[in-house]
C-alpha cells in the first residue's frame, strides 16, 4: 500500500495533542516484545496495521487533499532508485531514519529517508514531518517531494543536496569539504533566514526542535537548507510556550527546555547559537575536551570572550578572514545561547545583528546556559559585564537591547 501526500491542515495541532502519549506506549510495547520474543511479529503486525489506519484517518480529516507538488511514490520505484537500499547509497542518518541517495527513472537525484514501523517515533513523527513541510516553501528549507508507505516501510523523498551536511563538511577528523569564510557566513545567514521564516512568517509558527550541524544540508552552490522536521512543533499565534517531552540532540538543547520541558522559539535560537560557534570554530559541540580541560564548546567560547581572546576559537583551517566580521558572528552566537531565554534575540533580530545593521550592545550580554550530562544546567555571570546572575532557573523579562547604527 502506498500513501497519499498532503498539504498543511487545520487539524495539525489536534493530532499532536491526541497522540501526545504515543512515545510512552511504543516504549512499553518494545519492552513487552523483549520479555516475550515469541510475540514480536504479532506486535510488528499491530504496528503496521495502526500505521495504515493512522494514514487513512489523517487523509479523511484532510478531505483527501494532495499538495500539488508532492508525489505518491511506489515502493518498487524507490527500491529501484536506491539499488534495493544498498549500503553504498547510504548518505546519512537523521533523527528518525536512514537516508539513501537515489536516482529516479527520469534521472532526477533524490534523498530517500526510510523509517521503520518498529522504530520509536512510529507514525506520529512521520505524519508530523509530512504535515509540517509539504506546504512549506523557502530557499533555506529542504523540499519534500513525496512519500510512500509499504508494509512496515515509511519513506520520505526529498530533493537531493550534493554537498551533504555541515557536520560532514566541517566537523570531525574526516572533513569532506574546505569551506572559506564567505561560505561559512552564508551557512549561518541562510540558516537564520530559514528559522526566521518558520518562527515569524509561517502561520502557524513552527519550532524545529532539532537544529544541528547534521540537519543543515548544502546544495551545489553551498547554500544551506534546514532538514529533518520529525520533531517540529506548531505554535498558534496565541500560544507562548508548549510543555512537551524532551527531544533533540545533546549539546544543542537549551537548558530551560531540558530542565522544565518548556518549549519556545528561543530553544531554536539557542541551537542556532551553538551551530554558529561550530561553523566558525570547525569543532563539534558534542565534545567536552576544549580549552585544555573538560569544557563544552559554549563554555570555552565564553571563557575566551571574557579573556578577550575570542579569535582563538576560529578554525585554524580558515587562513584568511575578516576579523571584525568573524568576531561579530561569534558574539551574536553568544547572545543566542544566553542562559536566560528571554534575553535571546528573535531570529529576525539575529539576521540584522549578523548583517551589521545594528550595533551589538555587549553590556546586555550575559553568560551562556548549557546542560551537562551529569544532570545540571549552568549559567555563570560575566566577570566584567554584568553583576546579574543569569541561570535557566531565573527567567527575566528584560529583552535584548540592540542599538541602530546611525549614518554620519
Show which residues each predicted segment covers.
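Regulatory alphaC helix of protein kinase catalytic domains
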Residues: 126-131
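Conserved catalytic-loop aspartate of Hanks-type protein kinases
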Residues: 268
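Intrinsically disordered, low-complexity cytosolic regulatory tails
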Residues: 1-68, 322-332, 339-408
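A short, aromatic-enriched beta-strand patch in the conserved N-lobe beta-sheet
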Residues: 146-147
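Protein kinase glycine-rich loop
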Residues: 88-99
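A conserved loop-to-beta-strand element in the N-lobe of protein kinase catalytic cores
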Residues: 151-159, 163, 167-168
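Glycine-rich ATP phosphate-binding loop
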Residues: 100-117
Amino acid at each position: 500500500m502506498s500513501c497519499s501526500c498532503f498539504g498543511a491542515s487545520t487539524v495539525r495541532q489536534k493530532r499532536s495533542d491526541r497522540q501526545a502519549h504515543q512515545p510512552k506506549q511504543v516504549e512499553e510495547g518494545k519492552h513487552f516484545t523483549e520479555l516475550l520474543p515469541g510475540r514480536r511479529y504479532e506486535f510488528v503486525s499491530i504496528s503496521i496495521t495502526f500505521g495504515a489506519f493512522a494514514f487513512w484517518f489523517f487523509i479523511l480529516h484532510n478531505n483527501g487533499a494532495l499538495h500539488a507538488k508532492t508525489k505518491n511514490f511506489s515502493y518498487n520505484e524507490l527500491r529501484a532508485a536506491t539499488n534495493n537500499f544498498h549500503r553504498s547509497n547510504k548518505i546519512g542518518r537523521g533523527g528518525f531514519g536512514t537516508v539513501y541517495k537515489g536516482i529516479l527513472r527520469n534521472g532526477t537525484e533524490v534523498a530517500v529517508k526510510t523509517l521503520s514501523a518498529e522504530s520509536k517515533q512510529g507514525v506520529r513523527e512521520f505524519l508530523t514531518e509530512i504535515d509540517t513541510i509539504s506546504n512549506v516553501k523557502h530557499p533555506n528549507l529542504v523540499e519534500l517531494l513525496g512519500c510512500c508507505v509499504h508494509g512496515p516501510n515509511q519513506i520520505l523523498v526529498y530533493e537531493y543536496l550534493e554537498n551533504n551536511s555541515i557536520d560532514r563538511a566541517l566537523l570531525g577528523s574526516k572533513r569532506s569539504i574546505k569551506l572559506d569564510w564567505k561560505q561559512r557566513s552564508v551557512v549561518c545567514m541562510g540558516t537564520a533566514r530559514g528559522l526566521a521564516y518558520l518562527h515569524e512568517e509561517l502561520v502557524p509558527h513552527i519550532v524545529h526542535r532539532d537544529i544541528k550541524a547534521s540537519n543543515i544540508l548544502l546544495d551545489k552552490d553551498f547554500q544551506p537548507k534546514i532538514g529533518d522536521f520529525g520533531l517540529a512543533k506548531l505554535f498558534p499565534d496565541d500560544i507562548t510556550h508548549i510543555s512537551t517531552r524532551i527531544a533533540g540532540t545533546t549539546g544543542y538543547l537549551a537548558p530551560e527546555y531540558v530542565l522544565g520541558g518548556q518549549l519556545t522559539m528561543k530553544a531554536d535560537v539557542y541551537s542556532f547559537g551553538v551551530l554558529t560557534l561550530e561553523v566558525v570554530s570547525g569543532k563539534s559541540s558534542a565534545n567536552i575536551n576544549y580549552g585544555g580541560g573538560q569544557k563544552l564548546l559554549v563554555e570555552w567560547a565564553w571563557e575566551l570572550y571574557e579573556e578577550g581572546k575570542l579569535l582563538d576559537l576560529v578554525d585554524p583551517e580558515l587562513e584568511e578572514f575578516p576579523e571584525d566580521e568573524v568576531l561579530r558572528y561569534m558574539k551574536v552566537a553568544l547572545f543566542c545561547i544566553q542562559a536566560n531565554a528571554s534575553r535571546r534575540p528573535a531570529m529576525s533580530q539575529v539576521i540584522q545583528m549578523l548583517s551589521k545593521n545594528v550595533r551589538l550592545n555587549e553590556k546586555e550580554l550575559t553568560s551562556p546556559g548549557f546542560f551537562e550530562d551529569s544532570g545540571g544546567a549552568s549559567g555563570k555571570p560575566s566577570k566584567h559585564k554584568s553583576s546579574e546572575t543569569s541561570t535557566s532557573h531565573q527567567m527575566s523579562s528584560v529583552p535584548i537591547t540592540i542599538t541602530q547604527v546611525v549614518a554620519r
